[in-house]
Amino acid sequence: MTVFLPILVCLCGGVGASCRYLLDVTIKTYWQRAFPLSTFTINLIAGFLAGLVAALALGGTLDEPWRLVLATGFLGGFSTFSTAINEMVTLFRKHRYPTAAAYLVLSLGVPVVAAACGFLV
């Protein structure tokens, strides 16, 4: 698997990005408010799954190559913290200060809690 590992990581990154896109479009279809729920939800799921992958790897259930494929590949493509930062800046520019502040605090804190929950599952 060593020779194919970089290729598999890249392919899974593409799959993760595709899943992010589909979930983003689906959530935005039903949620049309100032708070960027789609990005928040995606990062919440990614945080939980990252914690789960870390726990499986630490427990010896998941080998290192598969950890790389799942965490670096799929979750790297799926999570979207750079979009979260951009959305915070956009909210500030539109003078939606309470929403921007809440989004900042929640986007930094909740995925960490989700990762801890995923690790403890």
Swiss-Prot record:
A Pfam family annotated for this chain is CRCB
Q: How is its activity regulated?
A: Na(+) is not transported, but it plays an essential structural role and its presence is essential for fluoride channel function.
Q: Its topology with respect to the membrane?
A: Multi-pass membrane protein
* The keyword Cell cycle appears for this protein: no
Family per record: Belongs to the fluoride channel Fluc/FEX (TC 1.A.43) family.
What PANTHER family does its record include? FLUORIDE EXPORT PROTEIN 1-RELATED
The name under which this protein is listed is: Fluoride-specific ion channel FluC 3
User: Which organism's genome codes for this protein?
Assistant: Bifidobacterium longum (strain NCC 2705)
